[in-house]
Amino acid sequence: MDNNLIFQDSNDLADLSGYLKRALRLDGAGAVRLRAFGSVLAVYVSPIYAGSLLGDGLTVIGLRTINLASENELDSLFLIEDLLAAAEKSIERDSLTVAPPKTASRVGWAGISPPRQGWVLSGEVEQEKISTWAKDGIAEVAEALPESIGSAIAARVRLQIWGKAVGIEYNFPAGSAFAMAGLGFIQKGVPVKVYRSHGWIRLSTDFGHVIAKESFRFS
């Protein structure tokens, strides 16, 4: 089957491009997983990932779905920058067809499979709280990391900070708030829905979803 992605209109293609640009800002060397289910394209990224092949560390996954003009079967991994370049090329040519670039090497988070079913709505969180938790985490990371610190230590510090629960009432990691804000999934004044399934928590709006395992660590 031809794996070219054919979008319904220019707005959908621009939506993919904008999402990839935001994801690239959060992880300049990051990967994106594309899964096509018929005419629905699921676009996964992971702005925060512990790097464990066992999936036992902090893993925060962003998901946005986009409708396609024709059915497709695809489950592949690409570098974000490569897929973004392909999308931008199609936009420049005024084309709605994107030819996927060469696939990327496997990354551990792409093998982690959050539940696809069994999600139960457990409440809502005000958008203002999500934004505040994201800003507080960014400030804490900046304060904790001197310019001279090594990259490996810096990565551990970031994971420590983003892995902390935002509070007793909402036991999801601060990294989920960071991803919701950074990926453009929140809108001023619009509450974020919270779903739970088998130890996972999903934050959802009309703009996208962020999925992570529950966190009960507060320091």
Feature names for model-found ranges:
Residues P47-G62, N171-F178, Y195:
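Short, Lys/Arg-enriched charge-dense amphipathic segments
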Residues N3-N4, N11, N67, N72, ...:
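Detector for Asparagine
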Residues M1-L58:
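N-terminal ordered "arm"
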Residues I80-S219:
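Long, compositionally biased intrinsically disordered terminal regions
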Residues R35-A42, G62, K102, S122:
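A sequence-level detector of short, solvent-exposed, charge-rich linear segments
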Residues Q8, R35, I66-A69, E81, ...:
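A structural detector for beta-sheet-dominated domains
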Residues S52-I91:
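A broadly used, surface-exposed interaction patch
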Residues Y44-V45, S52-T65, V210-F218:
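Short amphipathic beta-strand/extended segments with alternating polar/hydrophobic composition
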